[in-house]
Amino acid sequence: MDVRRITKNAILLALLCVTGMFAIPMGENIKVSLQLLTLFIIFGITDKLFDKILIPSLYLLLGLIAPIYAGFQVGITPTFGFVISFVIIAIPFHFLYKYIKLKEIFRYIIACTVSLFICYLFGSIFMAIYLNFSYGKALLISVVPYIAFDIIKIAICTVAIKLLPDSIKTAPRSEQHDQ
């Protein structure tokens, strides 16, 4: 891994940490965070699967000791399953975005949507277990109120990825042959 790639990953991790802390109140008990928005942009501009896994993994570990999760939370909370899923969704996102035979914008939307559903699944299961709720109740609390906001986030990410210059989205020439 060269200096440019390490620096890019460090900047993206810092961006995730900073944007992930803030949660915008949208009503009673509904706070919309920017974690997924930032994560999907990170996934769209990191070329290597390793980087897509590394950044959310470091975010997960840092959040165990520092208040960088949504709403300045720290440690294992009822929503920790969503943070765990950030590491897991890197894999399907990577393969869907890189290898589906469609235009880039459609690959990106599909990768984000599938990843979002996996995130919902892991996060709501973790919440149900953590709070000793039924899966249905956890789904109603942790997923349903956020679906519209997450669709908007995917739309924003798609526009952002489309507008970013290719130089930001690609690996340095010397690393493009690596997987």
Segments and roles (model prediction):
Residues G20-K31, Y59-I91:
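Interfacial aromatic-anchored transmembrane helix boundaries in multi-pass membrane proteins
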Residues M1-L54:
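Hydrophobic transmembrane alpha-helices
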Residues E28, F72, E104-H177:
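Membrane-embedded alpha-helical hairpins and interfacial helices in multi-pass inner-membrane proteins
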Residues L16, G44, Y59-G63, F86, ...:
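Alpha-helical transmembrane segments of multi-pass membrane proteins
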Residues L16, G20, I42-F43, G63-A70, ...:
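Structural signal for membrane-spanning alpha-helices in multi-pass inner-membrane proteins
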Residues I6-I11, L37-I41, K52-S57, T79-I84, ...:
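Hydrophobic alpha-helical transmembrane segments
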Residues G44-L49, P92-I100, L163-I168:
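Structural signal for the C-terminal ends of transmembrane alpha-helices
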Residues T79, V83, V87, I91, ...:
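Mid-bilayer segments of alpha-helical transmembrane spans in multi-pass integral membrane proteins
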